[in-house]
Amino acid sequence: QDGQYFIDPGSEKARNYVINIAKEACELGFDEIQFDYIRYPDSNYKYMVFKDENTYDNRIKNINSFLMVAKKEINSLGCFVSADVFGFILTNKFDGGIGQNLETIIENVDFLSPMVYPSHYSKGSFGYQNPNRNPYGVITSALDDALDRGVEEIKLRPFLQGFWHSDAEVQENIRAAEDKNLDWIIWNVSSSYNLGYFSKLDSWQLK
């Protein structure tokens, strides 16, 4: 719609195309391939035609069969495979119509990066009327849900919010991950990061 397209996650042609590009990147020297938008579209289904019927079981099957094959082929070249997913799947077991399920997807990646951006949580999430203004509590709660569901710390590497937040609020994003002994990535669409985000990092890591 509006000139934008989603590939069908069940299409062998599309899947092989993506895997082949990932393998080329490995051969060029990159040590990790992270799959973004590893999901079904979340709206406007009336415009879409899928190879398989758009059911929960088929969505989960297609996302994970792609990752399973991709991981096998990419790992064989010495590269890690990771994926970023919506933060809500850490807490909810339903896939939200997009084919992301925590227990299955974690088995088919080396690392998982849930996008636990506080601004993306709705009012009342984890008991916060304004989740975006409570980054530490929101992220801690989301990560606790993942760890409680058996995700290993070494595989969990959240995306943190590097936009719409002050330096102090980004620091709270980071502190939430550091307090769980997790690696993390900060996301900003323009790749613009203030040094102030990281001013307290040494003191947290030396605890």
Where are these regions (language model features)?
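Active-site-adjacent "subsite" loops/lids of carbohydrate-active enzymes
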Residues: 1-24
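Surface-exposed, active-site-proximal loop segments in enzymatic domains
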Residues: 1-9, 43-53, 126-128
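Soluble non-cytosolic domains of exported or imported proteins
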Residues: 8-16, 57-64, 133-140, 167-171
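Conserved, mostly hydrophobic/aromatic
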Residues: 18, 25, 36, 105, ...
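Alpha-helical scaffolding segments of alpha/beta enzyme cores, especially the outer helices
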Residues: 20, 24, 62-72, 76, ...
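Active-site-proximal loop/short-helix segments
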Residues: 28-58
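Aromatic-lined carbohydrate-recognition surfaces of secreted/lumenal glycan-active proteins
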Residues: 34-35, 59-99, 152-165
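Substrate-binding cleft of secreted/luminal carbohydrate-active enzymes
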Residues: 109-123, 132-207
